[in-house]
Amino acid sequence: MKDEQLYYFEKSPVFKAMMHFSLPMMIGTLLSVIYGILNIYFIGFLEDSHMISAISLTLPVFAILMGLGNLFGVGAGTYISRLLGAKDYSKSKFVSSFSIYGGIALGLIVILVTLPFSDQIAAILGARGETLALTSNYLKVMFLSAPFVILFFILEQFARAIGAPMVSMIGMLASVGLNIILDPILIFGFDLNVVGAALGTAISNVAAALFFIIYFMKNSDVVSVNIKLAKPNKEMLSEIFKIGIPAFLMSILMGFTGLVLNLFLAHYGNFAIASYGISFRLVQFPELIIMGLCEGVVPLIAYNFMANKGRMKDVIKAVIMSIGVIFVVCMSAVFTIGHHMVGLFTTDQAIVEMATFILKVTMASLLLNGIGFLFTGMLQATGQGRGATIMAILQGAIIIPVLFIMNALFGLTGVIWSLLIAESLCALAAMLIVYLLRDRLTVDTSELIEG
């Protein structure tokens, strides 16, 4: 295994190495966005913009649940990988058990502190009038499924951590497939509308979590679901949370950004929220593919920063070129068939026109957004956790003043363009931070090989 890793780090063609490290991550991130696409796609057949808005308004809550999953999934997953590299299989059982039951406990806490306040939370998210009840109903199902949603994110990360990316993809594919089957049955067959969409996603997450649990119980001797092993110590907590907290923070700030944006859009009516919801789901496809690409090559870039800076530069060039190709293809698609893409989700012409405009603007930020992902990953890989944390905070902080200024100057059009402006500023900030820290970047290459 070590020789194979060294081959991809040092000798394989750059593109082959890039795909080896990135493809599983790209597929995983791509599948994760399909959940939201499915819900809006099927709800769109009901031709009710209030329902589309209700689903769109819940995006920040989903980001928070994902963040709670990443707290243990990313944090413990990377720790488990290091333990396996050190042949410390026994300790990995304790880490996995604690993280699994810690995630379940977090999910139960989410139910207790949110379910009684679903209406109030829906209002905070920006729901008004008829949309308020629909959003609240969707949130209730989401909150009740929180333990399984969090568990799903944790176990999916564990599958990757132990070197079973195919198991991760099978679990996600099965979940998406089940959602495709359940959504039309629950939404139309049982006439549950928004609640049906929420139930379809919830049941799919439950099924996926159970799939992973059964797999680990039968096939893994390094991931344990035995609650008796859920005994944390100071070292374990430190190793999990020093990586998990930044991952959690990034997801939380993503949700906060979505919340602030929803509040601005709410001033311009239901159609503005629905339009953004559709365009956001569409732009997520290439955005998450690029995110997976950038996160996947982090070990490759980090290793060659120390071992072969020429190869590192070639990798960075290859990633930037790949981002550029994705950007050109997506922009071409948006400007040629963007109207038809949006039309798959609604027949309301006002929403179609607005969503198409938003899609063009947000897709235009894809190139700089991708470069921002790449440079943030470089900061993480080369030991600059503080720089990466600063970037995560900036992503949430920059958008707020930009929104206020652009909204005051140009109204709804300004709110939409603020997305492109904020992404551009974040990308420039990432490049500046990397430049300023260029002489301080260090990495432990032995950890990369072992992990």
Curated annotation (Swiss-Prot):
Identify the GO cellular component terms for this protein. Answer: plasma membrane
Query: Molecular function terms in GO for this entry?
Result: antiporter activity; xenobiotic transmembrane transporter activity
Give the UniProt subcellular location, in the record's own words: Cell membrane
User: Between which residues do disulfide bridges form?
Assistant: none
Identify the CDD domains for this entry: MATE_MepA_like
How is this protein induced? Repressed by MepR.
Q: What stretches pass through the bilayer?
A: 26-46, 54-74, 97-117, 139-159, 170-190, 194-214, 245-265, 282-302, 318-338, 355-375, 397-417, 418-438
The biological processes this protein is annotated with in GO are:
response to antibiotic
Tagged with keyword Membrane: yes
What membrane topology is given?
Answer: Multi-pass membrane protein
Q: Which UniProt keywords apply?
A: Antibiotic resistance, Cell membrane, Membrane, Transmembrane, Transmembrane helix, Transport
Record's family? Answer: Belongs to the multi antimicrobial extrusion (MATE) (TC 2.A.66.1) family. MepA subfamily.
Q: Which PANTHER family match?
A: MULTIDRUG EXPORT PROTEIN MEPA, SPORULATION PROTEIN YKVU
Q: What does this protein do?
A: Multidrug resistance efflux protein involved in transporting several clinically relevant monovalent and divalent biocides and the fluoroquinolone antimicrobial agents norfloxacin and ciprofloxacin. Required for transcription of agr and RNAIII and involved in the production of protein A (spa) and toxins alpha, beta and delta.
What is the protein's given name? Multidrug export protein MepA
Record the organism. Answer: Staphylococcus aureus (strain NCTC 8325 / PS 47)
